[in-house]
């Protein structure tokens, strides 16, 4: 503590400096809080995710209308919205003349000033492109009603245009406007899954100014794979093969999958059940490439089932003996017995399975797995991306009195917290999520060891009955490949998913996490909201918001929308309903064709100030430290 005081004294070495900082903090604490955007289940759909960020989930259009009113035509406002969202595309359409720049840049400056009106000048400055910060501030705060200032403004603007800096200047202004409109981003899980653009999503998140991430079930297997879990790795690669983006991640992360493709090519034949699901990308693949993916898909699936068999036997404490599926198969008869019922197997590809020891990998399978794991773990880009997930991520987040988590809080059929029992210790509710987070961070410390308890628990997070990220009785992957009876495909949800409609249970969960404020809410992803069937994203008497982003096109027929995101500004919550995203060019041509529909859920009586937020608590603590410094050293 004494050392900390010495550091403070070095920075604030006079009474005046302490007073100045206290005054600055007080000013910041009394400003309105910034706008937060909550988004979940991106599922690798980069273009749709990028659009939500670029359009600020519909806030941009609103701000343009509020800023310019009737002074601009609707067409002009549309074009300005497109410019701020996709400046690269709009500026690249055709050569812009000096008159266009002279008209457009002042409009962008007006919009920037409007977007930053509730912030301190210091915060606005931090949002500006560093190379133009001084010029932009001069232009922002020039009173053009005065003749001299108007001339000053016009001269600077003309000089920027003549130096051919107008394009990068507009790019910078557009980014600054977007940054001021979305102050903080919450990603409530599942960056990864079916889409091809997960790497691009994380690239964008790496450069986002303020964010947090709540891990989803699909995120956790990527993390597990990087930390050394072979079972997680095979799940990651199998899903990539199934949805046709295996070669995309090979390229994105510089992976070496040659040993896998050589092994699969000579071991497996065509099997239509393993034909990749390409989701409209069929024209990008030749029949030869599709056949190769079919073979690789089979190889990855069988190796995954073997490794999972091994893991379950290695961890009897996980109580997953019923999931040792390969041991239940009669390989001569090609049938499997589940719950005393025998089922015929179809689409089989058991060439490498030894019926006497179904879990054993062949030497070639072992070589392929070791090669893939080494490649996955040695990728520099993978290391950067996993570092972001660890540094910004967690099992849950308490932020501004709200609880954010991806999957579920496991509950008993009675509605009580359901315990995970491990080595006679019970973990339930908040303790359960803390337990898994501890082990995830332990596994991250040594990625050379892939079969320790902590790393195996990451795999359990993916498909274990009491995983807060999975939330189902059982994952039926093998059944879906090889059994026609769809009854065996069913995955029974945890009781949480019915109880989350109960206000009483939602209140119980909030209190379990120490949240007793009437303002507290829960934000949950993971499950698509089937709007077409009358489901609502608002549950539990308004205490819970389910915001599965619905960006995955495969779910949009079921949901009837492209999902939801959530906004929270100083006035309260707004729910945003998204329309299916087509492409950026369509947005540029017709911005309002992609309109996001907003619903105000609740308005607070008084605007929420920074002093009432999570960041505000930190600033108040700083203020108290400075008061202590003032009284102890300067006001004695």
From Swiss-Prot:
Pfam families: FBPase_2. SUPFAM superfamilies: Metallo-dependent phosphatases. Coiled coil: none annotated. Its cofactor is Mn(2+). Pathway: Carbohydrate biosynthesis; gluconeogenesis. Its EC number is 3.1.3.11. One of its GO terms (molecular function) is fructose 1,6-bisphosphate 1-phosphatase activity. InterPro entries: FBPtase_class3, Metallo-depent_PP-like. It catalyses: beta-D-fructose 1,6-bisphosphate + H2O = beta-D-fructose 6-phosphate + phosphate. Keywords: Carbohydrate metabolism, Hydrolase, Manganese. GO terms for biological process: gluconeogenesis. The keyword Nucleus does not apply. The keyword Manganese applies. It is an enzyme of class 3 (hydrolase). Belongs to the FBPase class 3 family. This is Fructose-1,6-bisphosphatase class 3. It comes from Streptococcus sanguinis (strain SK36). The gene is fbp.
């Amino acid at each position: 503590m004494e050392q900390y005081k010495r550091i403070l004294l070095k920075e604030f070495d006079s009474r005046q400096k302490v007073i100045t900082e206290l005054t600055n903090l007080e000013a910041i604490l009394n400003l309105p809080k910034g706008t937060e955007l909550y988004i979940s289940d991106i599922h690798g759909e980069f273009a749709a995710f990028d659009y939500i960020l670029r359009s600020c989930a519909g806030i941009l259009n609103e701000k343009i209308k509020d800023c310019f009113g009737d002074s601009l035509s609707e067409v002009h406002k549309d074009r300005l919205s497109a410019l701020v969202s996709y400046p690269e595309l709009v500026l690249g359409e055709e050569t812009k003349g000096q008159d266009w720049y002279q008209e457009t840049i002042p409009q962008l400056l007006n919009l920037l000033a409007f977007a930053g009106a509730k912030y301190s000048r210091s915060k606005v400055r931090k949002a500006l492109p560093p190379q133009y910060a001084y010029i932009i501030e001069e232009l922002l705060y020039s009173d053009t009603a005065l003749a001299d200032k108007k001339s000053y403004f016009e001269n600077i603007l003309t000089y920027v245009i003549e130096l051919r800096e107008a394009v990068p200047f507009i790019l910078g202004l557009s980014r600054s406007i977007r940054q001021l409109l979305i102050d903080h981003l919450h990603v409530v899980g599942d960056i990864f899954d079916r889409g091809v653009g997960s790497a691009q999503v994380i690239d964008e998140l790496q450069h986002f100014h303020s964010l947090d991430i709540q891990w989803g079930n699909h995120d956790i297997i990527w993390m597990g794979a990087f930390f050394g879990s072979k079972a997680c790795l095979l799940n990651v690669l199998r899903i990539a093969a199934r949805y046709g983006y295996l070669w995309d991640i090979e390229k994105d992360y510089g992976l070496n999958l040659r040993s896998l493709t050589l092994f699969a090519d000579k071991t497996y034949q065509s099997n239509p059940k393993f034909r990749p699901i390409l989701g409209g990308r069929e024209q990008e693949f030749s029949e030869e490439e599709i056949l190769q993916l079919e073979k690789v898909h089979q190889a990855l699936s069988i190796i995954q089932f073997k490794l999972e068999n091994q893991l379950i036997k290695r961890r009897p404490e996980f109580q997953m003996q019923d999931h040792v599926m390969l041991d239940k198969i009669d390989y001569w008869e090609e049938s499997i017995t589940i719950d005393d019922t025998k089922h015929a197997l179809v689409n089989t590809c058991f060439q490498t399975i030894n019926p006497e020891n179904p879990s054993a990998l062949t030497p070639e399978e072992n070589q392929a797995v070791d090669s893939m794991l080494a490649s996955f773990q040695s990728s520099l880009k993978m290391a950067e991306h996993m570092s972001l997930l660890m540094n910004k991520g967690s099992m849950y987040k308490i932020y501004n009195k709200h609880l954010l988590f991806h999957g579920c809080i496991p509950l008993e059929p009675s509605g009580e917290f359901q315990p995970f029992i491990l080595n006679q210790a019970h973990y339930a509710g908040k303790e359960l999520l803390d337990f898994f987070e501890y082990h995830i961070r332990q596994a991250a410390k040594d990625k050379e060891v892939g079969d320790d308890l902590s790393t195996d628990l990451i795999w359990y997070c993916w498909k274990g009955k009491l995983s807060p990220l999975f939330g189902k009785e059982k994952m039926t992957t093998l059944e879906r490949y090889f059994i026609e009876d769809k009854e065996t495909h069913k995955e029974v949800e945890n009781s949480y998913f019915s109880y989350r409609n109960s206000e009483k249970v939602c209140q119980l969960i909030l209190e379990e996490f120490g949240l007793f404020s009437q303002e507290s809410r829960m934000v949950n992803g993971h499950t698509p909201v089937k709007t077409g069937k009358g489901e609502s994203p608002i549950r539990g008497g308004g205490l819970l918001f389910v915001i599965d982003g619905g960006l995955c096109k495969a779910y949009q027929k079921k949901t009837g929308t492209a999902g939801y995101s959530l906004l929270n500004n100083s006035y309260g919550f707004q729910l945003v309903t998204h329309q299916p995203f087509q492409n950026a060019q369509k947005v540029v041509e017709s911005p309002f064709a992609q309109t996001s529909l907003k619903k105000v859920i609740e308005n607070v009586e008084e605007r929420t100030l920074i002093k009432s937020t999570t960041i505000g608590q930190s600033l108040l603590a700083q203020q108290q430290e400075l008061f202590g410094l003032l009284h102890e050293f300067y006001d004695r």
